[in-house]
Amino acid sequence: MNRLKKGDDVIVIAGKDKGRRGVVKSFAKGGSLVLVEGINIVKKHIKPNPNRGIEDGVVEKELPVDASNVAIFNPATEKADRVGYKFVDEKKVRYFKSNGELVDL
């Protein structure tokens, strides 16, 4: 179950960008892939297409990473953390499992 939301500060826990932080921009494939700002940047070679006005060159592009390779970043502990749900004033909120602080303020 993916407990991330758009705008969450996450840290990469596996892969070539391990240890880097970024903000969740969007989700793909039903939430199993996460597009994180500044993470998993690849270079794509573009062929020219004069009919469409596209020039050739190399473009840097962000690709999504698997949701299992990122974890939410806890600013209090400065580490990756797990998220749980609980009810506060009859409202369902997310909290960090390590210290019990609320994620959504």
From Swiss-Prot:
Q: Which domain of life is it from?
A: Bacteria
GO cellular component terms attached to this protein's record: ribonucleoprotein complex; ribosome
Family matches, as Pfam families: KOW, ribosomal_L24
SUPFAM superfamilies recorded: Translation proteins SH3-like domain
Which molecular-function annotation in GO is an example for this chain?
A: structural constituent of ribosome
Annotated transmembrane regions: none
What's any GO biological process attached to this entry? Answer: translation
Q: List the disulfide bonds.
A: none
Name the UniProt key words of this record, in alphabetical order.
Ribonucleoprotein, Ribosomal protein, RNA-binding, rRNA-binding
Show the CDD domains listed in the entry. Answer: KOW_RPL26
Subunit details for this protein?
A: Part of the 50S ribosomal subunit.
State the family named in the UniProt similarity comment for this chain. Answer: Belongs to the universal ribosomal protein uL24 family.
The free-text function statement in the UniProt record for this protein reads: One of two assembly initiator proteins, it binds directly to the 5'-end of the 23S rRNA, where it nucleates assembly of the 50S subunit. One of the proteins that surrounds the polypeptide exit tunnel on the outside of the subunit.
Against NCBIfam families, the record matches this protein to:
rplX_bact
Entry's HAMAP family?
Answer: Ribosomal_uL24_B
For this entry, the protein name equals Large ribosomal subunit protein uL24
**Where is the organism placed in the taxonomic lineage, from the top?**
Bacteria, Pseudomonadati, Pseudomonadota, Gammaproteobacteria, Thiotrichales
What gene is this protein translated from? Answer: rplX
